């Protein structure tokens, strides 16, 4: 699948990226390169290959040092207020962020 210039303009508009017409050719080439790599990956036969939880688990001699998922500090109203003091805007104990999807 190859993208044309209109496809690139549409993708830029949907992603809310300002892409001047003189840069569309370069973006088109880069996106088409990425799509080509994806097509090559999809062509690889993975039948019978056991899924990995982590890429390093394919090597038996490597031990992963993953930390335990444990609470490291207790949540308190004072701690919440301290963290929210760093936020540009907050409401009802939550961070407010700009809307990114129209």
From Swiss-Prot:
<dbReference type="GO" id="GO:0006450">
    <property type="term" value="P:regulation of translational fidelity"/>
</dbReference>
<keyword id="KW-0648">Protein biosynthesis</keyword>
<dbReference type="GO" id="GO:0050566">
    <property type="term" value="F:asparaginyl-tRNA synthase (glutamine-hydrolyzing) activity"/>
</dbReference>
<keyword id="KW-0067">ATP-binding</keyword>
<dbReference type="GO" id="GO:0005524">
    <property type="term" value="F:ATP binding"/>
</dbReference>
<keyword id="KW-0547">Nucleotide-binding</keyword>
<dbReference type="GO" id="GO:0070681">
    <property type="term" value="P:glutaminyl-tRNAGln biosynthesis via transamidation"/>
</dbReference>
<dbReference type="Pfam" id="PF02686">
    <property type="entry name" value="GatC"/>
</dbReference>
<comment type="similarity">
    <text>Belongs to the GatC family.</text>
</comment>
<dbReference type="InterPro" id="IPR003837">
    <property type="entry name" value="GatC"/>
</dbReference>
<dbReference type="GO" id="GO:0050567">
    <property type="term" value="F:glutaminyl-tRNA synthase (glutamine-hydrolyzing) activity"/>
</dbReference>
<comment type="function">
    <text>Allows the formation of correctly charged Asn-tRNA(Asn) or Gln-tRNA(Gln) through the transamidation of misacylated Asp-tRNA(Asn) or Glu-tRNA(Gln) in organisms which lack either or both of asparaginyl-tRNA or glutaminyl-tRNA synthetases. The reaction takes place in the presence of glutamine and ATP through an activated phospho-Asp-tRNA(Asn) or phospho-Glu-tRNA(Gln).</text>
</comment>
<dbReference type="GO" id="GO:0006412">
    <property type="term" value="P:translation"/>
</dbReference>
<dbReference type="InterPro" id="IPR036113">
    <property type="entry name" value="Asp/Glu-ADT_sf_sub_c"/>
</dbReference>
<protein>
    <recommendedName>
        <fullName>Aspartyl/glutamyl-tRNA(Asn/Gln) amidotransferase subunit C</fullName>
        <ecNumber>6.3.5.-</ecNumber>
    </recommendedName>
</protein>
<keyword id="KW-0436">Ligase</keyword>
<comment type="subunit">
    <text>Heterotrimer of A, B and C subunits.</text>
</comment>
